[in-house]
Amino acid sequence: MLLAQRRLFSLGCRAKPIKTIYSSKVLGLSTSAKMALRFKNAKRIEGLDQNVWVEFTKLAADPSVVNLGQGFPDITLPSYVQEELSKAAFIDNLNQYTRGFGHPSLVKALSCLYGKIYQKQIDPNEEILVTVGGYGSLFNAIQGLVDPGDEVIIMVPFYDCYEPMVKMAGAVPVFIPLRSKRTDGMKWTSSDWTFNPQELESKFSSKTKAIILNTPHNPIGKVYTREELQVIADLCIKHDTLCISDEVYEWLVYTGHKHIKVASLPGMWDRTLTIGSAGKTFSVTGWKLGWSIGPGHLIKHLRTVQQTSVYTCATPLQAALAEAFWIDIKRMDDPECYFNSLPKELEVKRDRMACLLNSVGLKPIIPDGGYFIIADVSSLGVDLSDVKSDEPYDYKFVKWMTKNKKLSAIPVSAFCDSESKPHFEKLVRFCFIKKDSTLDAAEEIFRTWNSRKS
């Protein structure tokens, strides 16, 4: 039982204090509930608690569901990558802390690889930062360089963490949509999606600090052309703006297309941070290693964020990754190089998925890069009007499909700001970096689905 004083006020007149005996049951609040009221969330994370991955990964956890939602590979990893990790685990000093900004052998390997690509010398100690995945690189960049009140331009649809990361920094996301110039009756590809240069320029202001670029793009699979990148570069230079370039799918580009690094364009190196990912490069998403590459005057601010948060990344993983890179750096012109063999393998899987989607009346957007394929589900005519939810149609459709067809995907409106969601809610995203048996299971679901429609 608790003893407390209750002060009573009536019509502005102060009454004498009286003692009241009460219990927590009378108040109807448990101790944890009272603590929850007392210790609320920090304002910087207000409204950021919803996450598409938490919700839909849980739905796909049922073993009977074929998971084409979350973007993790279930294909066989390169054996040499696994072998290098095994070796590293048995070296005593590789099980201890390493350099906080990147294991020496890894930053040297990255310097060698990207030095060849950029055709310039990259300082491994000053111009490269190894991070906790591409997420870590994005977080470091935004926290280290974006101030409250700044504006950050984001193209829609966008990888879902961009918006909340910008808001956590107290900044304002400014959105511009990619629009499709699709012609009915023709093959729909990610190249059909582009931005309007005049509309993009209108988004720049005196408050613009940065633009976030994603190429190859998730979820659409767009590979930005040199001409498109030049428009972005010219605007960044004109408005003295940073470019945060998320290029984690850089090696996954398909026939007829080429990945171009925006930092390689004239005048862009000094204002660009380029993000890479071990998970996407070597199909090891669970390693959670990424990197930022850019000029020392920008990287140093990202280092400050890292040293006051995670400080360093796992040593044996970095050491193993370095050795894997050296193996493929030495054979970059060889078809067996993983940078070359993986996109060829995935192009076959992409084409297979496109056929499967077409077979049930879904209209796919053929990606030029990445390992996701989007489909328009409106032609299926699945009536979900009786579902009691104010969620966008694609959210309800994916939940319905997961429950009734045992096939999971991700709603594309999850990659949109609130204003753009209605324009994308008939699209869903499927992942195709899956082993053949997984795609076989998906094919069987599609075949059964199609036969029941007939």
UniProtKB/Swiss-Prot annotation:
Keyword list, A-Z: Acetylation, Aminotransferase, Lyase, Pyridoxal phosphate, Transferase
Protein function: Catalyzes the irreversible transamination of the L-tryptophan metabolite L-kynurenine to form kynurenic acid (KA), an intermediate in the tryptophan catabolic pathway which is also a broad spectrum antagonist of the three ionotropic excitatory amino acid receptors among others. May catalyze the beta-elimination of S-conjugates and Se-conjugates of L-(seleno)cysteine, resulting in the cleavage of the C-S or C-Se bond.
GO molecular function, a single term: cysteine-S-conjugate beta-lyase activity
A biological-process GO annotation: L-kynurenine catabolic process
Residues with the N6-(pyridoxal phosphate)lysine modification: K280
N6-acetyllysine carried by residues: K116
Coiled-coil residue spans: none
Gene (name only): Kyat3
Similarity comment text for this entry: Belongs to the class-I pyridoxal-phosphate-dependent aminotransferase family.
Catalyzed reactions per annotation: L-kynurenine + 2-oxoglutarate = kynurenate + L-glutamate + H2O; L-kynurenine + glyoxylate = kynurenate + glycine + H2O; 3-hydroxy-L-kynurenine + glyoxylate = xanthurenate + glycine + H2O; an S-substituted L-cysteine + H2O = a thiol + pyruvate + NH4(+)
One protein family per Pfam: Aminotran_1_2
GO CC terms, sorted: cytoplasm; mitochondrion
Name listed for the protein in its UniProt record: Kynurenine--oxoglutarate transaminase 3
Cofactor(s) the protein requires to work: pyridoxal 5'-phosphate
Pathway note: Amino-acid degradation; L-kynurenine degradation; kynurenate from L-kynurenine: step 1/2
Residues binding substrate, per UniProt: G71, N218, R429
